[in-house]
Regions:
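A cross-taxa feature marking solvent-exposed loop/turn segments within ectodomains of secreted
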Residues: 3, 42, 55-57, 69, ...
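Terminal connector regions
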Residues: 3-6, 92-110
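Beta-sheet-dominated interaction scaffolds and their linkers
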Residues: 5-52, 73
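Solvent-exposed strand-loop boundary residues in beta-sheet-rich modules
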Residues: 14, 66, 108-110
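Short, solvent-exposed loop/turn segments enriched in Ser/Thr/Gly
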Residues: 39-46, 82-84, 94-102
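Short acidic, flexible loop segments centered on an aromatic residue
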Residues: 52-68, 103-106
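Intrinsically disordered, low-complexity Pro/Gly/Ser/Thr-rich segments with frequent PxxP/GP/PP motifs
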Residues: 68-95
Length: 110
């Protein structure tokens, strides 16, 4: 628990036990396995955000290139969990593991 602040982190599952991998700049890596046979294929990955702090987090958003983001909530209370759906377009014939790079942004003031 982070006392006196909001602290939002991204997780693989609803139980929020395993945090997504981060690089040194604070961007999250989301690895997904892809096989695309259609001309274009939309891949949707669901991840979860949890506020581990004691204060409310406002304007929670994911920033990245070539991705559409749907967020269940834009504000997270203390210990609240919300899902985030990330959609990316996959070209035909793309196989293997695809990495989505995204950055989590939020504010502690409304």
């Amino acid at each position: 628990m982070y006392i006196g602040q909001a602290k939002v982190k991204l997780f693989h599952d609803l139980s929020c036990k395993k945090e997504l991998k981060k690089d040194i700049s604070g961007k999250y890596f989301i690895d997904v396995r892809v096989i695309s046979g259609q001309p274009t294929h939309t891949l949707t990955k669901r991840i979860y955000a949890k506020n581990l702090g004691t204060h409310k987090a406002y304007n929670v958003n994911l920033v990245g290139s070539n991705q559409n983001v749907f967020m269940q909530k834009k504000e997270l209370k203390s210990n609240e969990i919300s899902y985030i759906d990330i959609s990316v377009e996959i070209p035909k014939g793309d196989k293997g593991i695809r990495t989505i790079l995204t950055k989590l942004e939020y504010t502690q003031l409304p």
